[in-house]
């Protein structure tokens, strides 16, 4: 409104500040006017320079393409006419022109096509490096972090999985003063599954501490600490609660390195727990959404607490944000206690073959691996030899392309996932089809076995009917083998 505009003019902060300077005789009207003119001239010159710097690579690209056009053999190119068809204010406009020119070249004009395709690749790479790089803090295609296996004594104790996580965190806190662990119920009670039992008392309230229940603020604290050189481990109590922090994880953490062209990093580790247990708010596995929204963050899905501990050890040697999803039903499951806690490292971006086989490849991750492994053992009794592969790292995914090596051997694939249909399993299949080119090696249709569309209701019956069971896996695998050889396998 006019009234509001008048108020803005009368209360303009620069105007009031100038009046304050004059009233307090800190400067004169003439000096202020001179400063204003100097600033105005400076801004105009810098604006002009900025525009020239922006235009320079565009002009270079245009001149380069004109030079290429002039050297094409057997073609009389009207350069002025060609460039009149585009608004060459961006490099992409010039790349676009080149690509469209290639479309109209004769099919047998291979030499000119090669020249233009080389030019197109050069400038497409320039654009990619400028606008489509640094999504991750490290080059995941060259992720070469050497892993260290957990060591065991011949008579190593079998302990609850929570003990392995707890004692591993204890070693990490002892060895690195920059590590802080915090979240809801993390401090006094040592987290809801006792994976941090006694660590606040031992290492102090400043190192292991409780927060409020707002997941967004927990992540926000972690981002700020990580950007300042600390190594925070921020706990989101259950994977289901990640939704409350999804915006800040997606907009702030996942994009930080990308939007600053690698200039800033926040190697925050988000610790959470999920997958199957019993309860509608504590059995979530929304990996499909996370994989879509959180590109830029590693998403790691260990099947047990030893693998989880190894992931923390590996991540603390990288400047890369990550989410580690501990399996909820693993805290009371017995595992051997490693002797090199705090030092062994689970490889990131590498699958693990849990059982070799020749007939069919079963791929899964997290808590469902136990179900798949049990089903594979039972299928052996029915003359079906399954190869069981633990993905364990969804982002990055199977960097060494070991899954396709298995499929070349078995020619069949079943992906088992406790996310909803179209979720994590579809991501895995897309990775395998697009990046590992498995289609040519399949003799049967790739099969997906997922949870139901709804959240799992409370109770064992609800869990059984909502998420893949041993029987579900058995029947799905058996149906693939029956379809491939109905004479060998009877119908069930």
PLM regions and their residue ranges:
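Thiamine diphosphate
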Residues: 1-321, 325, 328-492, ...
